[in-house]
């Protein structure tokens, strides 16, 4: 029988800690996985103690997922190379702007049979334009990478409330392996082969959620927010089709949890919506609100809107994506929040 697969979780924020609860529990039950799960923790001090030591003694991430115990077989490791040493399965769940540096650091220390899955909701811009996070990991580390996206608010997953998720995998065998690692009776997973679209959904919906939050801050009501969701979905589909490498975008993928379901839950319950609402109401900067509302964690929606805007500008396509553009300009160019409504009124869908 093959040796059990060693698992490393790269990241330990709110979502990383929630997913560690599932992985730790499944690794204890399933013989194909090594019982000990290493979780890389970006070391910081919390109430005078190292976060990694708190996690390993109290079995709780008191900073990013307070109130939820982690299984005792999940071990916090502050040195990334130590955490990833000999790992067969890598679960990436860090803010997308750090992924290149982390991959560089892990080079040469993972197993020869290593495979990865990214839960990172973001994209990058390279010299040729759009760059998916999975592509960066694949190129830097030379491993196959699947993606998991879905309507998965971290605290609800941690509380074991029922939800669905989608794995996109170009190698079906690897997608099914990660399904075994991650699925529970309350976290149900579908595996599809349209991996790039699954990943794009996870990134682009955060831009739409910022727009939904602006509407909430302006007290526009549910009808307006429904329009933001619909027009945002149209722009997500158009963007995916525009940038697909091989015309492989399937409309059916947008009906999976990674698509319309994730879009709805994020526009009603996610942190991007919440911070955008506060931005509209208070006039404080995104950076100030991240510190106040997210313990300093980075908000992905505004960052992704900037990356998308630069890609669209490079391609001369800004005017075809007015909702994405409005979010970027409100966040970064001091345009008034009310421009969100103007963009809906004059959206090409209505002309």
UniProtKB/Swiss-Prot annotation:
Its EC number is 1.1.1.8. It is found in: Cytoplasm. Keywords: Cytoplasm, NAD, Oxidoreductase. InterPro entries: 6-PGluconate_DH-like_C_sf, 6PGD_dom2, G3P_DH_NAD-dep, G3P_DH_NAD-dep_C, G3P_DH_NAD-dep_euk, G3P_DH_NAD-dep_N, NAD(P)-bd_dom_sf. It is an enzyme of class 1 (oxidoreductase). GO terms for cellular component: cytosol. The keyword Cytoplasm applies. The active site is at 205 (proton acceptor). NAD(+) binds at residues 11-16, 154, 271, 298, 300. Plays a role in regulating cardiac sodium current. NCBIfam families: glycerol3P_DH. Belongs to the NAD-dependent glycerol-3-phosphate dehydrogenase family. This is Glycerol-3-phosphate dehydrogenase 1-like protein.
